[in-house]
């Protein structure tokens, strides 16, 4: 207890979503356990459970590809690391491009291999065996990650949290943080909604879609926009068998199998962005998106003649101007920001936790493949966004 009757900790993490508890887990793995996670609801109750859960390392930004590779290694060893099933299913991942993107696909695959990603180009005939229901005529080349697949972000968050608790880290649910405590240019803790405080040397803000307004109250502009993302579940009407995740960069859609025999559909067309209030948005696909689903899925998978939409849901992405995250020391001493994941957060979450832990403990990344400067907040004000070296026509920011 401090003199004001509040709590104390070396580190406070604001936000008990996936990235917040991944950070707690990573700190615990490094022996730093005087940590309190403050979550206004319950662990993973925000946008974590809305993730489509796709696991792939196919990024044109090398540091992101490396982070995804780290995430994959953790997911593969989940039973050993966490002692529980986190819902990871290793179906494989295929990405298909049209003729305009063949050269950049090959360059991207080569760059991914340089940072340890197991990936290769495969022939159309192989993809036809993997996805016999798909019309592959519009595609000119395909990339393949045998170790890719999909997972369950909510289950993964619970595993991170359980591991952190086992290490001695405190996770306080139903504990809303209203503001930072600041003395001059130094963060000294957080103020809670119940009027109490937690004093701390370091505060990690991992508040996702709520980050911009939270930090704006302290004069810190974090350029994050909130976009509603819609997902549709489809029963294909046929027995699919074991099919991989399929990222279609011709019609800009992605599908993945589901344990119930359904497929999950998402749209990856950046022309379809929709701003949203994360506290008041439509939590299902609208009629326009359902029509889009029927059109895109019907075109790519003509064998789905008896397909039926079974359900839908929506969540919100915290999107930065360059569609890459902010994992950075903030403008106040002792402040670290981990937000703006732009739809990439689940697959890289173990690496996010480790990078934040590095920044807190060492002041820099300990993984040479992942320079912390790539994700610095200041890059936007400097006019130096983080961009893929090998953009795809129509989907550059998403890769």
Regions of interest found by a model, annotated:
Residues 194-244, 367:
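Central helical "cap/lid" subdomain
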Residues 178-198, 203:
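Conserved beta-strand-loop-beta-strand element in the redox core of flavoprotein oxidoreductases
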Residues 295-399:
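C-terminal catalytic lobe of FAD-dependent flavoproteins
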Residues 28-48:
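Glycine-rich FAD pyrophosphate-binding loop
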Residues 74-77, 97-167, 172-173, 179-186, ...:
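Flavin (FAD/FMN) cofactor-binding and adjacent substrate-gating region
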Residues 52-130, 252-254, 297:
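Dinucleotide-binding Rossmann-like beta1-alpha1 core, especially the glycine-rich loop
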Residues 5-19, 36:
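Beta1/beta-strand and adjacent pyrophosphate-binding region of the FAD-binding site
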Residues 236-334:
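Active-site lid/adjacent beta-loop-alpha segment flanking the redox-cofactor pocket in flavoenzymes
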């Amino acid at each position: 207890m401090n003199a004001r009757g509040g709590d104390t900790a070396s580190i406070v993490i604001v936000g008990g979503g996936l990235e917040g508890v991944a950070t707690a887990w990573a700190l615990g793995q490094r022996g730093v356990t005087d940590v309190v996670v403050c979550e206004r609801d319950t662990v993973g109750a925000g946008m974590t459970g809305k993730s489509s859960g796709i696991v792939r390392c196919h990024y044109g930004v090398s540091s992101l590809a490396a982070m995804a590779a780290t995430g994959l290694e953790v997911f593969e060893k989940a039973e050993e690391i966490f002692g529980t099933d986190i819902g990871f299913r290793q179906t494989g991942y295929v990405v298909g491009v049209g003729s305009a993107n063949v050269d950049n696909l090959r360059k991207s695959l080569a760059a991914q291999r340089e940072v340890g990603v197991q990936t290769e180009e495969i022939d159309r005939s192989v993809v036809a065996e993997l996805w016999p229901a798909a019309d592959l005529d519009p595609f000119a080349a395909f990339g393949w990650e045998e170790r890719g697949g999909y997972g369950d972000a909510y289950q993964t968050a619970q595993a991170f949290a359980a591991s952190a608790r086992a290490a001695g880290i405190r996770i306080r649910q139903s504990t809303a943080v209203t503001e930072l405590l600041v003395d001059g240019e130094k963060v000294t803790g957080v103020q809670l909604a119940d009027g109490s405080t937690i004093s701390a040397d370091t505060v990690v803000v991992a508040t996702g879609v709520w980050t911009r307004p939270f930090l704006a109250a302290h004069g810190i502009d974090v350029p994050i926009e909130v976009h509603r993302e819609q997902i549709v579940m489809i029963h294909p009407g046929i027995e699919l068998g074991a099919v991989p995740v399929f990222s279609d960069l011709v019609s800009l859609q992605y599908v993945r199998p589901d344990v119930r025999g359904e497929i999950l559909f998402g749209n990856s067309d950046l022309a379809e962005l929709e701003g949203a209030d994360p506290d008041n948005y439509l939590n299902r696909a609208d009629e326009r998106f359902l029509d889009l689903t029927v059109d895109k899925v019907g075109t790519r998978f003509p064998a789905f003649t008896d397909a039926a939409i079974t359900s839908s849901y929506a969540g919100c992405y915290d999107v930065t101007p360059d569609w890459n995250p902010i994992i950075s020391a903030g403008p106040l001493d002792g402040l670290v920001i981990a937000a703006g994941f732009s739809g990439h957060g689940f697959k890289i979450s173990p690496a996010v936790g480790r990078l934040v832990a590095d920044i807190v403990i060492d002041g820099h990344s300990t993984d040479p493949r992942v320079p912390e400067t790539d994700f610095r907040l200041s890059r936007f004000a400097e006019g130096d966004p983080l961009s893929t070296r090998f953009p795809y026509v129509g989907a550059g920011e998403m890769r």
